Amino acid sequence: MKGMELVSKVSTKKPYFFGNPKSKLKVAAIDLGIKNSILKNLANQDIFVKVFPYNTSFSEIEKWEPNGYFLSNGPGDPEPLVLDQELAKKIIEKNYPLFGICLGHQIIALANGIPTFKMFNGHRGINNPVINHETGKGEITSQNHGFAVDRKVLESDPNIIITHSHLNDNTVAGLKMKSKNCFSVQYHPEAAPGPNDCLLYTSDAADEEDSVDLGGR
């Protein structure tokens, strides 16, 4: 699995839309292997989604004038996905709202110079416990990944906060940038099927995007 780029095998070949075009918010989703339940979750938050292939250029996505950007879940090693790392860097540089889950979470870390590593035992299943450091509460999450973000390097970065940790092995389960509209989680916060007590990412993103000065976008 180390060094294997699998996203090109599962990503959509052409853009498509999901949700209500009259929704108050538009989100550009970068398809790294996106699940339909994630799209349904976004649509349920009154978000209109345009799903782009993983290798779409930033300029092409920006033309759609989304309110925010989303890096999806997906398979394989995040390190070979250089185009998506560069895409995340450009979004962050412009301070557009950006959030990611699973593989997208790892891409955001790599875009900030935080390395990832192959885990000895990956996290698989619907009952992975994490602690939310911002609320102090535990959450049961659905996870399916074999790579993780390097915690030691992340802890040394003054610009990023660890928001969630896995309770079994203390791996990073969530992060947030201090001065940018960017955050991510390592798990699948989906509405159905499975656990639904971790839907924070869509509601938080919607609130954040709605309150950010988007320059008329």
Would you name each region that the model predicts?
Residues 213-217:
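Hydrophobic alpha-helical segments, chiefly the membrane-spanning helices
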Residues 201-208:
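Conserved small/polar residues in nucleotide/adenosyl-binding loops
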Residues 85-99, 105-199:
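Pocket-forming structural segment of enzyme catalytic cores
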Residues 1-26, 36-40:
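Internal, non-catalytic "lid/hinge" segments that mediate substrate recognition, gating
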Residues 35-100, 112:
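Flexible gly/pro-rich beta->alpha loop and the following alpha-helix that scaffold active-site loops
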